[in-house]
Design a protein with these regions (language model features):
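Glycine-rich phosphate-binding active-site loops on the catalytic face of alpha/beta enzymes
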Residues: 92, 96-113, 169-171, 198-203, ...
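Conserved anion-binding
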Residues: 12-24, 98-173
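Alpha-helix-loop-beta-strand connector modules within alpha/beta enzyme cores
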Residues: 59-79, 114-130, 178-197, 202-203
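Glycine-rich, proline-tolerant flexible connector loops at the mouths of alpha/beta enzymes
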Residues: 47-65, 105, 167-176
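Structural preference for beta-strand elements that scaffold enzyme active sites
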Residues: 2-6, 47, 75-79, 100-102, ...
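Catalytic cores of alpha/beta
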Residues: 74, 78-97, 182-218, 239
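Short, acidic/polar
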Residues: 29-40, 86-91, 146-156
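Glycine/small-residue-rich loop that forms an oxyanion/phosphate-binding "nest" at active or ligand-binding sites
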Residues: 54, 62-119
Length: 286
């Protein structure tokens, strides 16, 4: 399971959204977006998810040069979303080095356009689906219901050529609820493309459950993290060690409790080290 580290950009700065919505609360971070991206990668993230909040909220693309700079200066695949509404915007992001581009509202309200974009960029377009409690999909920044529901939309957008599906649950983080495993199971049984869980991770136990979720031999391909770590729910080193499966039996996969104990032991014996790779090497040989 890949670990997608989120970098939210608003007014050229890195921000955290405690309630998952830019309209509710925004915390500006000390690190700039490039520093934040480098920080995630240095700690072990093997994917980045950049969300352009200015583009999403106002159609303002002032952050595009900064996004291109981040892409050029990290050595992991970067998925970019936020306000992507036209073929020209998709072309610009992919030309700038984006590995994948995420589309949300546009994929829902103009499936012909989405089909054309997927055709022009095979394997490069992900659909972001914001799911309401009744499985209706929200659009336009959670402000409207689309009238379409999860299962039918998965089928339609898969047929259109979506390379992946990123599922978020509207309001779930604000209510401190776990990921919606029923919706993830539905997605895994409905489409063959990668399914990414975004939001709802309250702690390592939820991350462990996502890692171990399996339906007919299929598993969640990735999980998006960011504010869970800056809020102190767990460390990135813990997340990296938990989602990586290459340790294999008899050493892993690790349970959340085992991982917390291992990290405590490591920190006690290596007080000056904050390097994720060193911790993982130690863990593998422990």
């Amino acid at each position: 399971m890949d670990l997608y580290a989120r970098v939210n950009i608003l007014e050229g700065k890195a921000v955290r959204l405690p309630r998952g919505n830019v309209k509710d609360e925004v915390i500006f971070l000390e690190a700039n977006p490039l520093e934040r991206a480098h920080g995630w990668v240095s700690k072990g993230a093997n994917r980045l998810l950049i969300v352009d909040l200015d583009a999403a909220a106002h159609g303002d693309y002032r952050n595009r040069p900064m996004i291109n700079e981040i892409i050029a200066n990290v050595d992991v695949p970067v998925q970019v979303g936020g306000g992507v509404r036209s073929p020209a915007e998709v072309d610009a992001l992919i030309s700038g080095g984006a590995w994948r581009v995420t589309m949300g509202t546009t994929a829902m309200v103009d499936q012909v356009l989405f089909w054309d974009i997927c055709r022009d960029h095979p394997g490069r377009i992900a659909a972001s689906l914001d799911v309401l409690p009744d499985q209706e999909l929200a659009i336009r920044g959670w402000t409207e219901g689309s009238g379409s529901y999860l299962e039918e939309t998965l089928i339609e957008l898969s047929s259109a050529g979506a390379a992946a599906f990123m599922l978020s649950e509207v309001g779930r983080d604000a209510l401190n609820e776990p990921p919606n495993f029923d919706n993830l199971r539905l997605a895994l049984t409905t489409v063959e493309e990668e399914v990414i869980a975004a939001g709802g991770v309250r702690g390592l136990e939820d991350l462990e459950s996502l890692r171990d979720l399996e339906v007919d031999g299929r598993q969640v391909g990735g999980v998006v993290v960011g504010r869970e770590i800056t809020a102190g729910r767990f460390t990135f080193e813990e997340a990296v060690a938990l989602v990586r499966r290459e340790f294999g039996p008899p050493k892993g996969p690790w349970s959340a409790e085992e991982l917390q104990q291992a990290l405590a032991t490591y920190q006690a014996s290596h007080p000056a080290s904050a390097d994720a790779e060193a911790f993982l090497s130690w863990l593998n040989g422990a």
